[in-house]
Design a protein with these regions (language model features):
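Metalloprotease/metallohydrolase-associated module, dominated by Zn2+-dependent proteases
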Residues: 2-74, 90-147
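Active-site recognition of the HExxH zinc-binding catalytic motif
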Residues: 77-90
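Polar low-complexity intrinsically disordered regions
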Residues: 1-2, 80
Length: 147
């Protein structure tokens, strides 16, 4: 395929694309329910803004439900955008808003743990995009160096 998918022909094509991006973005441990929504059949608004995709996230259980409206632009791009909402930095931002800890401590934890994890996941994902013949098991080798 030479270009991103604008409109999915079948539910299987949609699910296959979602699974491909979930794998390439390193979201293996997330349980995600993907729904392809026909245009104008579901309320796709957030704060009075019409959206091409909506993600309902449970960070604690690493579960998400992602609704994607078919044929509202580059639908494959919407899939990637919605999946990126699952990256760890959003967890830290939520905890910053909800705790009484000193902001310096939260920022240190955010910088040292969450951002590092996010960058590592993204780096692996982009390597897999560049080298499509590898999968996530390729990175299991690096864990041997830490044992």
């Amino acid at each position: 395929m030479a270009e991103p998918i604008i409109e999915f022909e079948t539910e299987k094509e949609f699910i296959d694309c979602c699974k491909w991006w979930k794998d390439k973005l390193g979201l293996w441990d997330w349980m995600i329910k993907f729904n392809l929504v026909a245009p104008n059949t579901k309320d796709m608004t957030i704060n009075n803004t019409v959206c091409a995709g909506i993600t309902d996230i449970n960070f604690i259980n690493k579960q998400a439900k992602i609704d994607i409206e078919n044929n509202v632009g580059v639908t494959e791009l919407t899939i990637v955008h919605e999946l990126l909402h699952l990256f760890p930095q959003f967890i830290a931002l939520e905890s910053m808003a909800q705790t009484g800890e000193q902001i310096e401590e939260l920022l240190d934890r955010f910088k040292d743990n969450i951002i590092h994890q996010s960058l590592e996941s993204m780096a692996k994902a982009f390597i897999m995009v560049k080298y499509p013949n590898i999968d996530r098991s390729f990175f299991d080798i690096e864990m041997q160096y830490w044992d």
